Amino acid sequence: MEQREILQPHGMKFMTGDKVFLDTNIIIYAYDLSAGEKHKKAKKIFAELWDSGLGVISTQVLQEFFVTITQKIPKTLDKRLAKDIVSDLLKWDVVVNDGESIIEAIEILIRYGYSFWDSLIIEAAMRGGAGVLLSEDLSHGQIIHGVTIKNPFKTEPFSL
């Protein structure tokens, strides 16, 4: 099944040693067959991160992914398959949000003007040691506390 294949190594490597934090939308596009070019690009990024071992996510990303992929995209995934994907993603570096994360996210919200949830994603990327945060929802090229935000769909060809 194509949707499970992207969880397997594909022999591609990132050019950087930086850990890469994936925002929920990138993972969703990797599984959303109706996403066209974004699906293809996200699938490639996702496979490269599996191979490199540089992928970082958070509990928030896993929660948002499960809800979106099983309820909100045009062709939803079966809940058991989505559960298996979440289980596989737990093999990545997973940042667990705690009280300190919430306070730091609020500081990011105050300083940079992002929503609380986006600020929590940025905080998780920082806490997870990521040098790059891939998201289509945040300001491409902005650097926050050493984390560079990149929109992989904004530039062609995309590179870290």
Where are these regions (language model features)?
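Acidic, PIN/NYN-like endoribonuclease modules and their adjacent C-terminal/linker elements
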Residues: 1-17, 122-160
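Short, well-structured N-terminal submotif of metal-dependent ribonuclease cores
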Residues: 1-57, 72-80, 158-159
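Short beta-strand segments at enzyme active-site cores
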Residues: 57-59, 134
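Acidic catalytic patch
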Residues: 59-63, 83-111
